[in-house]
Regions:
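Homeobox/homeodomain signature
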Residues: 56, 84-85, 118, 137
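C-terminal interaction surface of TIR/SEFIR-family domains
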Residues: 1-48, 72, 79, 120-218
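Short mixed-charge
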Residues: 45-59, 109-123
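TIR-domain catalytic/interaction hotspot
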Residues: 2-7, 61-116, 174
Length: 218
């Protein structure tokens, strides 16, 4: 009997969760983006269950975890250079965010490197329908990547994950989170997007000087 050699998975974060940050609201006692943080936790748990990702590596990276006082731009560039799949949470705030546009462009540069090397297989982008959106409300480039799935619950497309969670449809929302984790893991294996030198993004970050207060205030 031949020896079985298990196939090792890439030991990098599977998802970079790109989202339009909500501002603090004096009318609410809940932290902004609390539902998104919960979704990220559920998605991370499923990705750990579906893969052999080692402890100590974030399954899904969220920029809320950048330590206060750190060189946050360097942290963000490093994550954008290493995470395997971009996971944009589609919403009006994401579409109007300069930082989310930068995060998309960083992943596109990594993909272009693989195109130039002749090793590009497919996009390493898995959008999440976060807010309830009509197709005509989703602008390019987000509209150019598949964001709906025939085998997902029909109410996902009608309400988005935000609507499902807000209406107490937790069983449906958690099922969608599991299916999205499956999709992200599959895309990571298929795309095999290679890490790059974070310096590839220096000019993009330099162009954002003076914009830190928009969303990134670490």
């Amino acid at each position: 009997m031949p020896d079985y050699q298990p196939r090792a998975m890439v030991q990098e974060s599977y998802g970079f969760l790109s989202y339009g940050r909500n501002p603090e609201s004096p009318e609410s006692y809940e932290p902004p983006d609390e539902l998104l943080v919960r979704f990220r936790g559920r998605l991370s748990r499923h990705l750990r269950e579906l893969t052999d990702l080692r402890a100590g590596i974030d399954a899904v990276y969220l920029d809320k975890e950048i330590p206060v006082g750190s060189a946050w731009k360097d942290v963000l560039k490093d994550r954008l250079a290493r995470c395997q799949v971009l996971v944009p949470a589609l919403s009006p705030r994401l579409f109007s965010s300069k930082w989310c546009a930068l995060e998309w462009e960083c992943f596109e540069r990594r993909q272009q490197l693989q195109r130039d090397r002749g090793t590009f297989i497919r996009d390493a982008i898995v959008p999440v329908l976060w807010a309830p959106l009509r197709p005509d409300e989703i602008p390019p480039p987000y509209s150019e990547v598949q964001y709906t799935h025939r085998d997902f619950h029909a109410d996902y497309q009608r309400l988005g994950l935000l609507g499902l969670y807000s209406l107490g449809r937790h069983t449906t929302a958690n099922g969608i989170a599991f299916q999205l984790a499956q999709t992200i893991a599959r895309v990571a294996v298929m795309a095999r997007l290679e890490p790059c030198d974070p310096g590839l993004f220096d000019d993009l970050f330099d162009s954002m000087n003076g914009s830190a207060g928009e969303e990134h205030d670490a």
